[in-house]
Structure formats: structure tokens, C-alpha cells
């Protein structure tokens, strides 16, 4: 069983949990209370000098970036022909691009807009909201031609993006104007492994201060 240091309110943590469920990997859940400073303990700092979650431990392997963990879980534990992270080079490249879109565009813009409000009681910043909205508009374009973000089948890229948007929706972001994203989100809630835990975990984010 793999050790998994996490917080339920963390979107990247929930993405790892959903993919683990998809490939039938059991995680030994280790709740890490960041608000209490548990990530700064000597024990955790030795394990992960970045002091970040999620942190996935499989024997001597320690992964502290969620999307790297998603890829590893599929490569190491997924079936040879699993669709979560396809073996075909071109299909995999598209999945990677969508994963990096979440890592480098959507999630950072989400955090830039919402984190100051949640953790610092800041007033909403209009420019930051516009930047996040533009990222969702791009996702809407990606979803305009296919059912899922990288083609006709759900992949780890969908799961990573689903985790990010679940938190945004919990914080009041409305997907209805983005018709393709809205349609996709409904599908993810209905059919993604671990979807209900993702949605309920997103609600816990509201309690973090």
C-alpha cells in the first residue's frame, strides 16, 4: 500500500485519489494539517523538502507533484491497455498538454484569484478573475470538439482539471456560460471514479484559513 500525505480540500490531492481509484490502487491516507504547520515537521521535511502536498510514497520513490503522481500510477499500476494514460505516443502527447494546461494555466490562475480570498479575506480582484475566466474559456475550446479534454475517452487530464474546477464551483464559480465545460463537468460528476469524494472534499476547502 502506498503512503499518501494529503488534505481533502486540496484539488491536486483529490486528483491523485481519483486516479488511484481508477487504477485500483489502495492508498494509506496520512492527513497532513497544513494550517497547524504539520508540513514543517522535521519528519515530513526530510521526506519532502518542498513541504508540499500531495506527497506520494511508493517504497523508495517519493513524488511531490500531483500530475507526476497521476502518470506514475497509470504507468506502474494501470492495465497495459488502460485509457487513463494511453500508450499511443500522439494520444499521450495530447493528454500531457492538457495536464500541463492544468498545472501551468488553470490551477495557478485559480489559486491566484481564490487563495487570497480564502486565506487572507481579500476582496476579489477583477483582473485575476478575468485571467481565470480566460483559462476556462480555453478549456471550453478544448472541449468543443470532443467529449473529453483529450479525445473521446476520459483520461487523467480530465481528472486533474475536474479536481481544480470542483473547488472553483464550490467557491461559487458558475460554469453555465461555458457550455462545453458545463456539459463535461456534469459527465465527470456522474462517471469519474471518486467523483463524490472530489466534490465533498472541495467543500472542505471552505473551512481552511
From Swiss-Prot:
It is an enzyme of class 2 (transferase). Residues 1-81 form the GST N-terminal domain. It comes from the Eukaryota. It catalyses: RX + glutathione = an S-substituted glutathione + a halide anion + H(+). Its EC number is 2.5.1.18. Keywords: Transferase. Gene3D superfamilies: 1.20.1050.10, Glutaredoxin. Signal peptide: none annotated. Residues 88-209 form the GST C-terminal domain. GO terms for biological process: glutathione metabolic process. Glutathione binds at residues 10, 51-53, 65-67. GO terms for molecular function: glutathione transferase activity. InterPro entries: Glutathione-S-Trfase_C-like, Glutathione-S-Trfase_C_sf, Glutathione_S-Trfase, Glutathione_S-Trfase_N, GST_C, Thioredoxin-like_sf. It holds the Pfam family GST_C. CDD domains: GST_C_Delta_Epsilon (cd03177), GST_N_Delta_Epsilon (cd03045). PANTHER family: GLUTATHIONE S TRANSFERASE D10, ISOFORM A-RELATED (PTHR43969:SF9). Belongs to the GST superfamily. Theta family. Conjugation of reduced glutathione to a wide number of exogenous and endogenous hydrophobic electrophiles. Homodimer. This is Glutathione S-transferase 2. The gene is GstD2.
